[in-house]
Structure formats: structure tokens, C-alpha cells
């Protein structure tokens, strides 16, 4: 996790010791709210939240989790006030959101898709570059009118520094070919993730961008691991 080097003082590895082969998959998130919140769009939600400060709680999978840091970034970019309620995983968090004890949860689409389709939760937007194939009716955050906010969990392959450049390039080419195979996309779709290959250089830029964004949010919100 990008958060680990920021939140933890001692790790058995450092990012600077690794060389990227390439990005392989990304997973978006969805901004889900309890239906008692009288909004149907992301713009309406932001406006309502600002008019009703102190009335919203948001769930996360735990301190330092993607949902925690991602929601703090959302708060910082929109000026919305929400109180953090950390859980140990998604199970109890979803149950409390369904019960209305907590009103907001930014989480993975598969974990709330059934509740969205049944009307027990409202999905206001997905946080990636594209719409989620299992929730095609839900707009992206950008489509919903909020620019500059993006929250994707991604997976990349790395090797140790010092690996010969020609080996890194060959591995990257092999990964690219594998990502282009039809069965790879089918398996990714079934898992609820998107195949997205990036070159080693592009992967480095993505890591630098997200690390800077997360570090800023973590510092501003004074986030600590349990």
C-alpha cells in the first residue's frame, strides 16, 4: 500500500529500492450514501453536506485504509465536513451504513452493488477514470461535476533495483502482452478490476503523484495506524 511507507516508521523495504515493471490493474471505488440523505447526485450531496455540517458520519475499513484516506482527500477537496467512524473491514461498516447509523461509505463497487440495485443505498459516483461495468448507470466523479478527485486502488509489478535495464524492458513487454489477452480481461472483469497497463516510467509518475496526494491528506487529517 502507498500508505505504508508514509504511516509506518520501519518497513523491511523502501520504494526507492524497487524498479517498476509496469502497472497491471486498477480498481475504482463508489461513493455510497444512505437513502435518508435527500440527494440524488454528487453535486446535491456536497451542497447538502455543507448546509448541514456535523450531521454526517462516514465509514472506513480502518484507520489508514484506502476508504479512510480517500474520504479525507474528498473532504479536503470539497470542504465537506464528516466524522470518521473506522471499522475492521467492510462487513460491519456496510451493515451500519444500511441501518443509517453511518451515512457515507466510499468502498469497492462489488461490496455494495446489490444494495445499490435494491435501493437500500444510493451510489452517487464512481471514483475512477471510467464507469464501472457492473454499475454502468453510475457516473464518474468527473461526470458528476467534481474535477480533480480520483481514487483508484492499483497493482503494479516491481523488481529490485540493479536489475539490468534489458531485463526490466523484457519483463515489461511480456506483461503488456499478457494484459492484452482476452482471457486476462475476462478474469479481471470477474474480479471487479480493470486491466490497465502502464510503462515503467508512467508507473513511476503515477506512484509519485499518488504518494504526494496521500501524504498531504494523511498529514492534514493526522491519520495514524491503529
Regions found by a protein language model. Give the residues of each.
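Beta->alpha turn/N-cap motifs
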Residues: 1, 90, 107-112, 126-129, ...
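Hinge/capping helix and adjacent helix->loop/strand transition within the periplasmic-binding protein
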Residues: 2, 6-92, 141, 154-187
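Short beta-strand->loop
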Residues: 13-24, 59, 81-85, 103-104, ...
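Conserved functional loop/turn residues at catalytic and ligand-binding sites
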Residues: 41, 86, 100-101, 120, ...
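Non-transmembrane alpha-helical segments in soluble domains
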Residues: 43-46, 94, 98, 106, ...
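Alpha-to-beta junction loops
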Residues: 52-56, 80, 98-107, 120-123, ...
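Short helices/loops that flank or line small-molecule/ion binding pockets
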Residues: 73, 77, 91-101, 105, ...
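An extracytoplasmic/periplasmic, membrane-proximal ligand-sensing/linker region
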Residues: 77-80, 117, 140-143, 165-226
Amino acid at each position: 500500500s502507498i500508505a505504508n511507507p508514509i504511516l509506518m516508521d520501519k518497513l523491511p523495504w523502501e520504494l526507492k529500492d524497487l524498479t517498476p515493471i509496469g502497472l497491471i490493474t486498477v480498481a475504482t471505488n463508489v461513493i455510497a450514501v444512505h437513502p435518508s440523505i435527500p440527494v440524488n447526485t454528487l453535486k446535491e450531496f456536497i451542497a447538502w453536506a455543507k448546509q448541514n455540517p456535523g450531521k454526517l458520519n462516514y465509514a472506513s475499513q480502518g484507520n489508514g485504509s484506502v476508504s479512510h484516506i480517500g474520504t479525507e482527500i474528498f473532504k479536503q477537496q470539497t470542504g465537506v465536513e464528516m466524522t470518521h467512524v473506522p471499522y475492521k473491514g467492510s462487513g460491519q461498516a456496510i451493515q451500519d451504513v444500511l441501518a443509517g447509523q453511518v451515512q457515507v461509505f466510499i468502498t469497492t463497487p462489488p461490496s455494495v452493488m446489490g444494495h445499490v440495485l435494491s435501493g437500500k443505498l444510493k451510489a452517487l459516483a464512481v471514483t475512477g477514470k471510467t464507469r464501472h461495468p457492473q454499475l454502468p448507470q453510475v457516473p464518474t466523479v468527473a461526470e458528476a461535476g467534481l474535477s480533480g478527485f480520483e481514487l483508484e486502488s492499483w497493482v503494479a509489478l516491481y523488481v529490485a533495483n540493479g536489475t539490468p535495464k534489458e531485463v526490466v524492458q523484457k519483463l515489461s513487454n511480456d506483461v503488456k502482452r499478457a494484459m492484452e489477452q482476452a482471457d486476462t480481461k475476462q478474469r479481471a472483469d470477474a474480479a471487479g478490476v480493470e486491466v490497465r497497463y502502464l510503462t515503467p516510467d508512467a508507473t513511476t509518475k503515477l506512484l509519485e503523484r499518488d504518494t504526494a496526494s496521500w501524504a498531504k491528506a494523511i498529514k492534514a487529517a493526522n491519520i495514524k495506524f491503529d
